[in-house]
Amino acid sequence: MNSPIMIACAHGTSSPLGAAEVNGLRADIAELRPGLDVREAYVDVQDPDLVDVMAGLPEGEPAVIVPLLLSVGFHTKVDIAKAARGRAGSSASEPLGPDPRLAEILDQRLREAGATEHDAVVLAAAGSTNPKASVSVEELAEHLRALRGNRIVPAYGAAATPSVPDAVASLRAEYPGGEGQGRVIIASYLLAHGFFHDQLAKAEADVVTEPLLPSRLMAEIALDRYDAAAAPGGEAAGEAGAAPRDADAAVEGAGEADAAAASTAPQKPLGTGALEQPNHAQPRGFFKAFRRFMTKYFPR
């Protein structure tokens, strides 16, 4: 019997570098599992859209959607879960995080950035209004504390508190930076380069690490999620339901984003404690939501 098709579903981004990094993750997955049919899909910003990919799968072939996202949120609980339920023989795995191996990647990024034991670390996630997303970031912070002796403060780009700029500001008096002084370092808990990663540079930390990708460990985690969901009686993601929507995280996906909701929610400017929101979010997110509404209620 053939293995189920893997739908490696990312959020989507307008960043060419971020898109290349996510495509590299899919390539790593395929290289680690020769013969596995790995399909590309997105829930926003990029094509092919997850709904279209699912509709185009061979009839009768089982499939597992693996969210290339770092925590639960609107897209995992609603968009992805609905896509899995809407096709016979399909399921959805849990997202990539939290996982101790993500802390290993963050530890490597901090070492690459020259972090020392005297520095404070702001663990910067995208953010979500779903409380489970913040819980998963706190869990990841505990994994990172087990690897490093630094003071580690979780913070968020949007939708949750503290914001990344606020966390940096609160640590600055204690960690002034400069030669011989403890610094404030942002550990980018974001999947790839994109809008939110670029915004981290505006938070006035001394150093910002690179995002999680590229890393082969990410492909190993994705395959573990796939295997758990594909196994008989496997550990699939929870059912869809009324879920809070998230601030638009573009490709980074730590608390993955819903662009349409983000575009209508008031956002603080960076100087008052929140990262700016991407300009591309509103049109793409709106038209995707409108298309789904029309498909559901006015089928051809």
Please place each PLM-identified region on the residue numbering.
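Active-site-proximal alpha-helix that buttresses catalytic centers in soluble enzyme cores
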Residues: 1-300
